[in-house]
Amino acid sequence: MGIVRNQSIKNSISFYIGMAIGAINTVIIYPNAFNDHPEHFGLIQILIAYAILVSTFTTFGIPKTFVRFFPVIKEKGQLYFLSLIIPLLGFILSLLVYFLFKQQIFELLNASPLLKDNFFYIILLVFFIGFYDILTAVSRSFLSAAAPIFINEVFLKVYSMLLLLLHWFGYLDFTTFLKIYLFGYFLKFAVLFLIQWKNDRFSLSFSVNDLKLKEILSFGLFVFVGGASVMLVTRLDMMMIGSMLDLEQVAFYTVAFFIGNAIKVPGKSIAAISSPLVAKALEKQDYKETQTLYTKSSINQLIIAGVLFLCIWLNIDEIFSLLPAKFQGGKWVVFYISIAQLFNMITGINGTIIVNSKYYRYDLYTNAILVLTTVITNYFLILKYGIDGAAMATAISISLFNLIRLILIKVKMNMHPFSLQTIKTILLLFVMFFTLDFLPDSSYAFVDIIWKSIVVFILVIPAIMYFKLSEDINELIIEVRKRFLDND
C-alpha cells in the first residue's frame, strides 16, 4: 500500500490543484463568461460529452485491457501494436458513420441548430481523447500515472482558464474561442505522446502472432461493453437534458453537477494507481493483498470525500450566492450527486477488482442494469423535475450499481471493504455535520466559505488521528507535521 500512498499523494496534488482550477472555471468564470449566452457553455459540455462517449467505443476497451495484460505478456511490442491499431480502426469507423448517417444522427439526438453547426468537432475530439486514454494506460502500467493526470487535471484546466478569461473580457469571439479551446485536446495528447516517446515506451512489433488474441479480445470486449456502459451513464443525464430540455439547462446542470461531483476526486487518484496493483495481486491469486487494497481504498476515500461533503454542504447557500442569478437553481442537484458519490467512495475500488478478476464478465451484467436504470429514471424524472430529476436519476443509478457490485464481490470472493473504522467514520461525519450546521453566518459569502471550511479541518483532523480511522491518512498527517512543524 506504500506505493499506492506515495503515488496517490502525487496524483492527489494534481487532482486537487485541478479541482481548485476547475472550481474557479466552473463556478466563477464559465457562468460569467457565458452569462449572456449560457447555450454556448452548454454546447461545449455536450461536444465533450459526446466525444468522450464515442471515444470509449472506438478504443474498444483497450486502455483497461492493456493494464490487465501488461504484467503477464512478454511480447510487449506486439501488445503496443494491438493497442494502437484497434483504436485507429475504431476512429476510421466513427468517421464513416458520421459522414454516412449525419442527418439520422441529428434527428436521433434532437440536435439544436447550434449543435449541428459544430458537430464535426466531436469527431476530431474522438481521436485525441481516445489515444490519450491509450497513452494514459501505458503510464499506469509503469506505475507512473502522475504525468497524464497532471496534463489532464492541471495543464488543460489552466489552458481553458486563460481562454475563458480572454472570451469573458471580449478578446475572443465565441467561434474563435471554441476552436482554440478544443485545440487544447490535441495539445495534451501531443505532450503525453512526447513523454512516452522520450521514456522509450514504444518498442513496436508489427505483429500479433505471439499474443493470445482470443483471451485478450474476449477480455477487451467485456471491458469495452462495461466501460461504454459506465461512460454512457455518466454522460447520459447531460445528453438527455440537451435533447429533452435545451443547451441552457445543460449549462446550469453542469455547474451544480461539478460542485457535487467534486467529492469523488480522491477516489480517482487512488483508483488510478491501485488498478495495476490489483491486477498483479489477482494474477497471483493473492486475495489477502486484494482485500487490503479494497479495505484501505474504502476508508481513505470515505474520510476524504466525507470531509469535502461537509465543506460543500455547510456552505451550499454561500456557494450559490456567488453565481450569476441564472445559475442559482441547482442546490438539490449538488445534494443528490454528492450523496451518490459518497456511496460510490465508501464501496471502494469494487470495479477495479471485478474487471481484473476471473469474474470480469459480471462487469457487463452490472453495467447493463446500470444503463437500463439510468435511461428509465432519467426519462421520467427529467420530464417531471427538470435538472433536479436528472440528478435524482444519477443518484439512484450509481447507488444501485455499487450495491450490486458490493454484493457480487462478497458472494463470489468473500470480500467486503467495511470495518469498524467505517462505522466510526460515518458517525463522526454525522456528528460534525449536525454540530457545525449551527455555525453563524457573516454578511460575506466568501468569508463564510473559508472560515467554515477551516473549522471543519481543525475539528476533523484531530478526530481522525485520535480514533485512528486510517493508517495511511494518519501516516500522511504525521509526515506533513514533521516536515512543516518539526524542522527547527
List PLM regions with ranges:
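Interhelical loop/hinge segments that connect adjacent transmembrane helices in multipass membrane
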Residues: 1-4, 114, 170-180, 190-234, ...
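Signature of the first transmembrane helix
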Residues: 2-63, 91-99, 125, 218-247, ...
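Membrane-interface junctions at transmembrane-helix termini in multi-pass inner-membrane proteins
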Residues: 5, 69-72, 128-154, 338-369, ...
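Transmembrane helical elements of multi-pass membrane transporters/channels
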Residues: 7-23, 180-196, 209-280, 300-301, ...
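Interfacial segments at transmembrane-helix termini and the short loops linking adjacent helices
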Residues: 38-40, 102-122, 312-342, 348
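Helix-loop junctions and terminal segments of transmembrane helices
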Residues: 58-74, 141, 256, 260-298, ...
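Hydrophobic alpha-helical transmembrane segments
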Residues: 150-165, 169-198, 219, 368-373, ...
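Membrane-proximal transmembrane or re-entrant/amphipathic helices at the cytosolic face
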Residues: 434-488
